[in-house]
């Protein structure tokens, strides 16, 4: 046996965070247990859990302090409420059948315990560590979480210390607001007025980047640190280099022109994948987007069907094309399709029914007197609830 469990319970300085291993005495957990008892580390001295002096729980449990113990007051918290809490949690877990009794002499447990240096309340330390240890042990025995649970939760939660969530594009449709005006004042005004929403993307447009460089991405990030930011470079050469530059400047996605050589596009996609950002192929002036995608050995994450600003005055039709055909050309890879040019509140439903995943809107929002109101009109037309808007949860 080699099982792993984790749990966080409580609040304030007494919060308990438990990392736990349970495994066979003659396996790696047993070896680690013996090493912990015989190879001591200053400030992190392992100790056996005891229900009370002279009474260890079964399975035998070793406590390892995560935070350096610097004085006798902190030592008393580990050798007092934390030690008792962990031991009692293990003993109760056996009594309740979480750990089968017939395993108790064959396995050992290692529990890594967090005690904040400013923790004060011994009752909270006990209660929180008891609950967290018992929960971590239960999760270890149940092999929680399963892969499906992790997949479901990974893009929903916010890490407590980080404090905000970096958006990934898994819950289409999305509204992408393109800021093309090469004016930092406009950028700031737009960013401060667009609503916070799980289905909103910010695009640093090509003219904006040409004036200020990719460092403008970092400026956008300063104002909206949790935003999903697209760098519209319209790369035509050195695809791998420009994709890496966008990632280094904190972009979440980067755009390559579909008019670039195939080799450039493929290097661009590979580099974007390597650095963990989305690759977007802009098909402005590409005659057959589906044919282009089919020709690529590696497929992008997003294809943008784009009618340019300069053709709007000519009453050109939008370039949305046959979206299902483009997705089919990806050969089974999950492909998002963005539509840009001619997107209005009135045709949002038509675009979505046609298969669009991302609606790119520029001046209709960025030039509006009521930026927030206009943004909300598009979001409402998309008829998409916020992620977990109606979910009431503790940890799950």
UniProtKB/Swiss-Prot annotation:
CDD domains given in the database record: KGPDC_HPS
Asked if the Swiss-Prot or TrEMBL record annotates the protein with the keyword Transport, the reply is: no
Short name of one Pfam family: Fae
- The active site lies at 17
Q: Which residues bind substrate?
A: 19, 48, 66, 68, 83
Q: Might you name a Gene Ontology BP term for this protein?
A: 'de novo' pyrimidine nucleobase biosynthetic process
The UniProt keyword set, sorted, is: Carbohydrate metabolism, Lyase, Multifunctional enzyme
Q: Which reaction does it catalyse?
A: 5,6,7,8-tetrahydromethanopterin + formaldehyde = 5,10-methylenetetrahydromethanopterin + H2O; D-ribulose 5-phosphate + formaldehyde = D-arabino-hex-3-ulose 6-phosphate
Q: Which InterPro entries match?
A: Aldolase_TIM (IPR013785), Fae/Hps (IPR020868), HCHO-activating_enzyme (IPR014826), HCHO-activating_enzyme_sf (IPR037075), HPS/KGPDC (IPR041710), OMPdeCOase_dom (IPR001754), Ribosomal_Su5_D2-typ_SF (IPR020568), RibuloseP-bd_barrel (IPR011060)
Q: Does the keyword Cell wall biogenesis/degradation apply?
A: no
Q: Where is this region: Formaldehyde-activating enzyme?
A: 1-161
What is an example of a GO molecular function annotated in this UniProt entry? orotidine-5'-phosphate decarboxylase activity
| Residue numbers spanned by region 3-hexulose-6-phosphate synthase | 162-396
Its pathway, per UniProt, is: Carbohydrate biosynthesis; D-ribose 5-phosphate biosynthesis
**Entry's EC annotation:** 4.2.1.147, 4.1.2.43
Q: Which SMART domains does the annotation name?
A: OMPdecase
Annotated family: In the N-terminal section; belongs to the formaldehyde-activating enzyme family.
Query: Its biological function?
Result: Catalyzes the condensation of formaldehyde with tetrahydromethanopterin (H(4)MPT) to 5,10-methylenetetrahydromethanopterin.
Q: What is this protein called?
A: Bifunctional enzyme Fae/Hps
Name the species this protein comes from.
Methanocella arvoryzae (strain DSM 22066 / NBRC 105507 / MRE50)
């Amino acid at each position: 046996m080699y099982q792993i469990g984790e749990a966080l319970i409580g609040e304030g300085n007494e919060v308990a965070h438990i990392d736990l291993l349970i495994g066979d005495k003659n396996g790696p957990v047993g070896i680690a247990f013996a090493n912990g008892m015989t190879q001591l580390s200053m400030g992190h001295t392992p100790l056996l859990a005891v229900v009370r002096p002279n009474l260890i729980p079964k399975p035998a449990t070793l406590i390892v302090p995560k935070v350096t113990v610097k004085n006798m007051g902190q030592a008393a918290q580990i050798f007092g409420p934390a030690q008792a809490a962990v031991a009692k949690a293990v003993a109760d877990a056996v009594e309740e059948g979480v750990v089968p009794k017939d395993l108790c002499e064959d396995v050992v447990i290692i529990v890594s315990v967090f005690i904040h240096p400013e923790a004060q309340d011994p009752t909270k330390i006990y209660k929180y560590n008891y609950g967290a240890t018992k929960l971590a042990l239960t999760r270890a025995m149940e092999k929680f979480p399963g892969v499906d649970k992790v997949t479901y939760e990974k893009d929903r939660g916010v890490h407590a210390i980080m404090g905000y969530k970096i958006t990934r594009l898994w819950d289409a449709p999305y509204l992408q607001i393109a800021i093309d005006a090469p004016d930092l004042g406009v950028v700031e005004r737009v960013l401060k007025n667009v609503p916070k929403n799980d289905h909103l993307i910010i695009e640093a447009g090509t003219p904006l980047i040409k004036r200020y460089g990719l460092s403008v991405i970092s400026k956008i990030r300063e104002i909206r640190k949790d935003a999903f930011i697209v760098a519209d470079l319209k790369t035509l050469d050195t695809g791998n280099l420009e994709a890496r530059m966008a990632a280094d400047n904190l972009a979440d996605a980067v755009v390559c022109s579909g008019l670039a050589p195939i080799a450039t596009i493929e290097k661009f996609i590979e580099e974007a994948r390597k650095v963990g950002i989305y690759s977007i192929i802009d098909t402005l002036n590409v005659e057959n987007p589906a044919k282009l995608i089919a020709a690529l050995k590696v497929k992008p994450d997003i294809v943008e069907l784009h009618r340019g600003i300069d053709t709007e005055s000519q009453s050109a039709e939008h370039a949305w094309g046959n979206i299902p055909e483009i997705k089919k050309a990806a050969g089974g890879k999950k492909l998002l399709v963005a539509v840009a040019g001619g997107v209005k509140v009135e045709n949002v439903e038509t675009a979505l029914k046609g298969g669009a995943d991302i609606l790119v809107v520029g001046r209709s929002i960025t030039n509006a007197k009521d930026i927030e109101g206009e943004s909300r009109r598009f979001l409402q037309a998309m008829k998409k609830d916020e992620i977990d808007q109606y979910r009431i949860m503790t940890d799950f």
